[in-house]
Amino acid sequence: MGSTVAAALLLFLAAVPAVFAATFKVGDISGWTSNLDYTVWLTGKTFRVGDTLEFVYGLSHSVSVVDKAGYDNCDSSGATQNFADGDTKIDLTTVGTMHFLCPTFGHCKNGMKLAVPVLAAAPSPSTPSSPPSTPSTPSSPPSTPSTPSSPPSPPSPPSPSLPPSSLPPSASPPTNGTPDSETLTPPPAPLPPSLSPNAASKGVMSYGIIGVTMILMYAVMT
């Protein structure tokens, strides 16, 4: 399992430059030829490690890879590589400026030379992080709203108040001061019975007898 993963990773890394690499046909439709200003052709182009230069040319031309001095002097004697197949593809493998010229006499002087600035390869896209985990299952759905409690009982109707009990008519005289003919006047208090004349005389006699008796007793004692 581990070796399979490693092999797949190597294949991926090897494929990345190929995916982003570009092939530039030198001179475009004109190809590799004399009487063409290749500095103009370079304008607006960016070359990176991993790209390829394709030289398409006729039998009278060829391609030599030289250093800066050979480029400046149109001297191919110190060339590191020479090609004459008519369709030469050269991979750009190092950062820096690569110099090319046609070694045919007089062609380099007529502008058949090329200096290509090579930049580092474009950074490979970062490996996408693992996809976000699936959203967690939401917690139990919210509980259904509780059944509302029974509505409050309607207020009981007020009990009819009983009429005030009838009170007996007051015996007090009416406020207008006029005595009611129907109101009974309390009877006068009874008078003690008067003594008859006989009883009075008997009482006086009794008191007289008692007085005489007391006097006689006092006289005897003294």
From Swiss-Prot:
PROSITE patterns recorded: PHYTOCYANIN
Disulphide bridges: 74-108
Keywords, alphabetical: Cell membrane, Copper, Disulfide bond, Electron transport, Glycoprotein, GPI-anchor, Lipoprotein, Membrane, Metal-binding, Signal, Transport
Residues annotated as signal peptide: 1-21
Record flagged with keyword Transport: yes
SUPFAM superfamilies: Cupredoxins
Cross-referenced InterPro entries: Cupredoxin (IPR008972), Phytocyanin-like (IPR039391), Phytocyanin_dom (IPR003245)
UniProt-listed Pfam families: Cu_bind_like
Binding-site positions, Cu cation: 61, 102, 107, 112
Domain Phytocyanin: residue ranges: 22-120
Spans annotated as Disordered: 121-198
Domain of life, per lineage: Eukaryota
Subcellular location: Cell membrane
Composition bias, Pro residues: 125-172, 185-195
GO cellular component: plasma membrane; side of membrane
Main location: membrane
Lipidation (GPI-anchor amidated asparagine): 198
UniProt propeptide residues: 199-222
Described purpose of this protein according to its UniProt entry: Probably acts as an electron carrier involved in oxygen activation and/or lignin formation.
Official protein name in the record: Uclacyanin-3
Organism the protein comes from: Arabidopsis thaliana (Mouse-ear cress)
Taxonomic lineage from the root: Eukaryota, Viridiplantae, Streptophyta, Embryophyta, Tracheophyta
